């Protein structure tokens, strides 16, 4: 059981945070699309509350993951992996974090500028309504979601390509 990343494998905490993020995002993304088509009413309020709670949870997990990445550098990629692929992998990871943070922060700001009260880190926060800004943050929220979906597809495709065509054990590092 690794408590810190090794040269070849991620630590158990890193793996747990990764897979927890994956599970929540794979619930959260379809939930968000479902929410868009719901009429206003009790069901929408319930689903929206779940969506906000999961969104804030992802936000906290990503912050913890970023701190973990700073304190606990990632394992090195095998030198046999082409330098360009290593660069693309790094960029994909960075952009995944940027997209997730963009989604969560824009979602938070959209709710706040709509005049809603959010509880963040055990504090209730409310700001003055600004529906124009709320609409802009909603657009960022949507664009960031589509960006995230594209990045996830690239991420999974790269894992499959590495497993099937390159025969390396890249996936083992995070399992």
Residue ranges: model-predicted function:
Residues 1-175:
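Membrane-embedded alpha-helical bundles that constitute the cytochrome b-like, heme-associated redox core
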